[in-house]
Design a protein with these regions (language model features):
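Low-complexity segments
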Residues: 1-60
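Short, solvent-exposed coil/turn segments at beta-strand boundaries
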Residues: 94-102, 124-125, 145-151, 172
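Contiguous, well-ordered beta-strand patches that form the walls/edges
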Residues: 108-147
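Acidic/polar residues at beta-strand termini and the immediately following turn/coil
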Residues: 3, 96-97, 108, 122, ...
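Hydrophobic residues embedded in beta-strands of well-ordered beta-sheets
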Residues: 33-34, 40-41, 101-102, 126-128, ...
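N-terminal glycine/threonine-rich, aromatic-flanked beta-hairpin/loop signature
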Residues: 87-120
C-alpha cells in the first residue's frame, strides 16, 4: 500500500522514508509540551492548533476543479478505543487526492449520523489532520504511513486542551 500511495501523491519524496506515528512513543505529550521523535516541537496548544491549520482545507474553487481531482482510497476504518472492539458503531472512510487533500465520510450506526470529513497531509512530515466539515472544532490526526497499515493510532482534539487517543482499524 505504501509504495502505491507514494507514487500517487505528487511533490513528495516519501518512497523509501515512511514515518510511523506512535502516540506515547514517537509522539509524547509531557505536561504542556509535545515531543516528536525525541525533539520538543511545540506546546500542546500549539500542536493542536497546527493540526487544525492542516485540517482546514478550502473547498475546490469550481465544480470543474472538483470533478478534475484524482482520488485514491486510503480505506475504510472502524473508529474505536480498543482493538478488541468486536462491534464498532463508528466508521471512517478516507481518500487522498494527488495534491495531498484528505476527504471522506464518518458514519455512526448507533445514531445513523453521517458527516463529511476534510483535511490534508503535510508532505514534509507525513502528518495527516482532518476535521468534520460540520464540526470543524474537532480535529483528528494520525500519520499517512499508519493509514496504509491494518490499524492506525488517532488523536482526536476536542479543543486545544482536550484530546483523546483512538484507533482506526482497517475493515476488509
Amino acid at each position: 500500500r505504501w509504495n502505491v500511495l507514494t507514487s500517487f501523491v505528487v511533490g513528495t519524496s516519501w518512497a523509501s522514508q515512511p514515518t510511523s506515528v506512535d502516540y506515547g512513543n514517537t509522539v509524547i505529550y509531557t505536561g504542556d509540551t509535545v515531543v516528536v521523535n525525541g525533539t520538543q516541537v511545540a506546546t500542546a496548544d500549539e500542536f493542536a492548533l497546527s493540526a487544525a491549520q492542516l485540517a482546514a482545507v478550502a473547498p475546490p474553487a469550481s465544480e470543474a476543479e472538483a470533478d478534475a481531482a484524482e482520488w485514491m482510497p486510503l480505506g475504510t476504518f472502524a473508529l474505536s478505543t480498543d482493538k478488541s472492539d468486536t462491534e464498532p458503531t463508528k466508521v471512517i472512510q478516507l481518500a487522498i487526492s494527488k495534491d495531498g487533500i484528505i476527504s471522506g465520510t464518518y458514519f455512526n450506526s448507533a445514531t445513523d449520523a453521517a458527516m463529511a470529513i476534510q483535511g490534508a497531509v503535510d508532505k514534509e512530515t507525513q502528518r495527516v489532520a482532518f476535521q468534520f466539515v460540520e464540526k470543524p472544532e474537532i480535529i483528528m490526526e494520525t500519520g499517512l504511513y499508519n493509514l496504509t497499515q491494518e490499524d492506525a493510532p488517532l488523536i482526536v482534539h476536542f479543543s486545544p486542551t482536550e484530546r483523546e487517543e483512538y484507533l482506526l482499524i482497517r475493515l476488509k
